[in-house]
Amino acid sequence: MRREGISIPHSNYGPGFWHSTWADGGGAFTAGERGRLLAGHWPQLEIPPGSAVLVPMSGKSPDMAWLAAHGFGVVGVEISPIACEAFFAEHRIAAERAAAGPFVRWQGGGVTILQGDFFDLDCTYAAALDRGGLVALPYQDRHRYAQHLRRRLEPGGVLLLVTVEYDPARRSGPPFPVFPDEARQLFPGAVERSRQPLRRARWTAVGGADAVVWVMRTN
């Protein structure tokens, strides 16, 4: 499914929206679309175990547990304390909490989640996994986000990005659709690795959607 050049009308999807969404129990909008995708693509990137991996706007993503189990140092960034607590509770990990500059640091089981604003992050990482960050943002907010994410990668770093494509006339986000022209503009040099249809009923009921996997490497 490809539809280029779609602009998403302005909406307020700032921190207040996500705090409210998590409080209502609906934050994990990508839940259930995971499973084999990460296992099928991450090993091909040949990132050395022990490398620090950034997961922006992480929510309670089980991808963080998968990465930690495979020997990576995982750093998620998430605005909602509900999501941070839920991740560690669901994986039965006792987390330690401490202030860390502008963040509250949750840490345990090889996973660190920095509770706070992603734009306050100033560290760099060997790799990043974005499955729920870019697609959580409406069109007008994505350039700033992508620019900041690119700057968080070390020279020679790699980004694994997952976007979703669907007809925005059939449903509204989040997750928002991101089409190939925009993905390449936001992440220069990004290469499409795969696309596969999403088969859950909520997608088939609105005419279908594709999950698209991209890889970008920094110079």
Task: State where each predicted segment sits.
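Short, contiguous strand/loop micro-motifs
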Residues: 49-52, 136, 170-171
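Class I (Rossmann-like) S-adenosyl-L-methionine-dependent methyltransferase catalytic domain
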Residues: 2-47, 60-63, 76-122, 146-148, ...
